[in-house]
Amino acid sequence: MASYSTNEFRSGLKIMLDGEPCAIIENEFVKPGKGQAFNRVRLRKLVSGKVLEKTFKSGDSVEAADVMDINLTYLYNDGEFWHFMNNENFEQLAADAKVVGDNAKWLVEQAECVLTLWNGQPIAVTPPNFVELEITETDPGLKGDTAGTGGKPATLTTGAVVKVPLFVQIGEVIKVDTRSGDYVSRVK
């Protein structure tokens, strides 16, 4: 099995920790004035989604996680499972609500997603970085009303709620960054 040394740690690297695959979120190399250097690492467990911090001595070796990231097209949700299709061999995979998690609000039919598999089972779904969704509900923007923060909440077709500028109206399609949940622009 492949392994990584602490000097190879980077954000996004997937390693095994206590028999569970984890992804490195942050890696900080610390060299104190006295004593041995070490890496302070923030990890996200891929199965449970929990975030934890761990320190590794400089030069330690850690086993690489045997996970696969594959690009799939999101097809539909049947109420219990979200179905995805591999465009190369047309094989379909289903992921349950625990795997999809909060990313369900960003899944649009025919969107290219990344599915993370461990032992052949899906453990995480990553939606595209940007999605285009229609606004189904928002307050009407009053002309000249910019004394506040300049934003209002808007509900999208998937049920997600995003803060949008005052000039955006119901029925318009907007571009949203799925990593932060922020409004990016209107789609013409």
From Swiss-Prot:
<keyword id="KW-0648">Protein biosynthesis</keyword>
<comment type="pathway">
    <text>Protein biosynthesis; polypeptide chain elongation.</text>
</comment>
<dbReference type="Pfam" id="PF01132">
    <property type="entry name" value="EFP"/>
</dbReference>
<comment type="function">
    <text>Involved in peptide bond synthesis. Alleviates ribosome stalling that occurs when 3 or more consecutive Pro residues or the sequence PPG is present in a protein, possibly by augmenting the peptidyl transferase activity of the ribosome. Modification of Lys-34 is required for alleviation.</text>
</comment>
<dbReference type="InterPro" id="IPR008991">
    <property type="entry name" value="Translation_prot_SH3-like_sf"/>
</dbReference>
<feature type="modified residue" description="N6-(3,6-diaminohexanoyl)-5-hydroxylysine">
    <location>
        <position position="34"/>
    </location>
</feature>
<dbReference type="InterPro" id="IPR013185">
    <property type="entry name" value="Transl_elong_KOW-like"/>
</dbReference>
<dbReference type="InterPro" id="IPR013852">
    <property type="entry name" value="Transl_elong_P/YeiP_CS"/>
</dbReference>
<dbReference type="InterPro" id="IPR014722">
    <property type="entry name" value="Rib_uL2_dom2"/>
</dbReference>
<dbReference type="GO" id="GO:0005737">
    <property type="term" value="C:cytoplasm"/>
</dbReference>
<dbReference type="InterPro" id="IPR011768">
    <property type="entry name" value="Transl_elongation_fac_P"/>
</dbReference>
<dbReference type="Pfam" id="PF09285">
    <property type="entry name" value="Elong-fact-P_C"/>
</dbReference>
<dbReference type="Pfam" id="PF08207">
    <property type="entry name" value="EFP_N"/>
</dbReference>
<comment type="similarity">
    <text>Belongs to the elongation factor P family.</text>
</comment>
<dbReference type="InterPro" id="IPR012340">
    <property type="entry name" value="NA-bd_OB-fold"/>
</dbReference>
<protein>
    <recommendedName>
        <fullName>Elongation factor P</fullName>
    </recommendedName>
</protein>
<dbReference type="GO" id="GO:0043043">
    <property type="term" value="P:peptide biosynthetic process"/>
</dbReference>
<keyword id="KW-0963">Cytoplasm</keyword>
<dbReference type="InterPro" id="IPR020599">
    <property type="entry name" value="Transl_elong_fac_P/YeiP"/>
</dbReference>
<dbReference type="InterPro" id="IPR015365">
    <property type="entry name" value="Elong-fact-P_C"/>
</dbReference>
<keyword id="KW-0379">Hydroxylation</keyword>
<dbReference type="GO" id="GO:0003746">
    <property type="term" value="F:translation elongation factor activity"/>
</dbReference>
<dbReference type="InterPro" id="IPR001059">
    <property type="entry name" value="Transl_elong_P/YeiP_cen"/>
</dbReference>
<keyword id="KW-0251">Elongation factor</keyword>
